Amino acid sequence: MAAFGIATGGSNWFSALALGVTLLKCLLIPTYHSTDFEVHRNWLAITHSLPISQWYYEATSEWTLDYPPFFAWFEYALSHVAKYFDQEMLNVRNLNYSSSRTLLFQRFSVIFTDALFVYAVHECCKCIDGKKAGKELTEKPKFILSALLLWNFGLLIVDHIHFQYNGFLSGLMLLSIARFFQKRHMEGAFLFAVLLHFKHIYLYVAPAYGVYLLRSYCFTANKQDGSIRWNSFSFVRLISLGLIVFLVSALSLGPFLALNQLPQVFSRLFPFKRGLCHAYWAPNFWALYSAFDKVLSVIGLELKLLDPNKIPKASMTSGLVQQFQHTVLPSVTPLATFICTLIAMLPSVFCLWCKPQGPRGFLRCLILCALSSFMFGWHVHEKAILLAVLPMSLLSVGKAVDASIFLILTTTGHYSPFPLLFTAPELPIKIILMLLFTIYSISSLKTLFRKEKPLFNWMETFYLLGLGPLEVFCEFVFPFTSWNLKYPFIPLLLTSVYCAVGITYAWLKLYVSVLIDPPVGKTKKQ
């Protein structure tokens, strides 16, 4: 995994960074894992022991297969290695099976597939402008970017403690972005098409890909003022892109189309019967909306303005994944969230079309699409913030304003999954790892932009420092108060709402910077 190196002054520092974080991942193998561990074990069993015609129908476990076909084939491939570790993990009826060999296999499968992420980071480093490079290795943008991505705290806790496979999926996305910077548009489009059929959450950033490829690849030239030169449109390029999407989709969905199972597959991929918010509210607009509704309902009950018998039984803080009704405010439907998400994305997509800024403009639009979907999407998971945090790392080493936005977004976004790791042994691990990553991120970017104005104003500094008292209250004070029994949801509510404020601020600040940036005003041949 550490084979991808960038030699600087005779030292293979990239390999050292990759090897170091790999060793840390190995040390995290015995830590707590969530129900996602059983989810993926069950998918191994389904794809290994059942014919393809039953993959999206099997429901022995509540953790049914709900990822696109490429991920199902990925699990199928892993299962043929898993059988040499413990054959019993591949039995569909062995629910909640977790032997020591199963643990080792699943943990190492995540570590091994992270090789793609390492390679993608290596390729992204090639796209970084080295003009700001300092004399010291640790002050070079490529070194800072490598550390921010390879040692990303969010990926470490979500993949290697909580348990998921975000590393190699993020690697596909970063590699696709790198190919655009390298003007290898067809390859970038192919990688993204493949990624969509691994995990459909990346549909959120598809508008950025579609508009950028149409504007900057299918149209081969601009006028002097940056507007489109309409006679430069290439039908050949458009057909080539369409062919890529068609062939990848046919390879993924073709077998299920032949089995007349596409409706069943899509019903698994888009389960709208789940509630607006996850069991733990993702820190987005709907968390603020739901928290306001919760406050109004508590006040209404205390003042006897609401009838307790008429309050919906499906509580948003019960930890259950189900549909629910808001108590005071109007309940939100999937259609409403879709419309809000679309409206939130439109300005960024409009800027990408009307104010082309090359791959960097595409990257900004991608991040805004990811954040807009996070802010207003249906049943958003708190872990989805990584979809914006990781690509934002690339912007952070380019401009001071982007570094400021990145630090606010990543610090807040990384703190928000803390409630996922609720066991005592993981408490010092998550606190120490986040502190180390946050301190490094702030200090390295401050050094990189030391000749410019401070990265934070007083309000931003005060907000970020507030995460410390919030953690102390939630972990060490609240459990010993009388409110713990009557209002057990308060720590989750406070964490979600506080982080939602920071993420909303970062989203708005990035939007402002995109809207005021001028277009690239010269003709460019792609």
Swiss-Prot record:
Tagged with keyword Ion transport: no
Record bears the keyword Endoplasmic reticulum: yes
Entry GO MF terms: dolichyl pyrophosphate Glc1Man9GlcNAc2 alpha-1,3-glucosyltransferase activity
Function as written in the Swiss-Prot or TrEMBL entry: Dolichyl pyrophosphate Glc1Man9GlcNAc2 alpha-1,3-glucosyltransferase that operates in the biosynthetic pathway of dolichol-linked oligosaccharides, the glycan precursors employed in protein asparagine (N)-glycosylation. The assembly of dolichol-linked oligosaccharides begins on the cytosolic side of the endoplasmic reticulum membrane and finishes in its lumen. The sequential addition of sugars to dolichol pyrophosphate produces dolichol-linked oligosaccharides containing fourteen sugars, including two GlcNAcs, nine mannoses and three glucoses.
Organism: Bos taurus (Bovine)
Stored InterPro entries: Glyco_trans_ALG6/ALG8
Membrane topology according to the record: Multi-pass membrane protein
Descriptive protein name: Dolichyl pyrophosphate Glc1Man9GlcNAc2 alpha-1,3-glucosyltransferase
Listed pathway(s): Protein modification; protein glycosylation
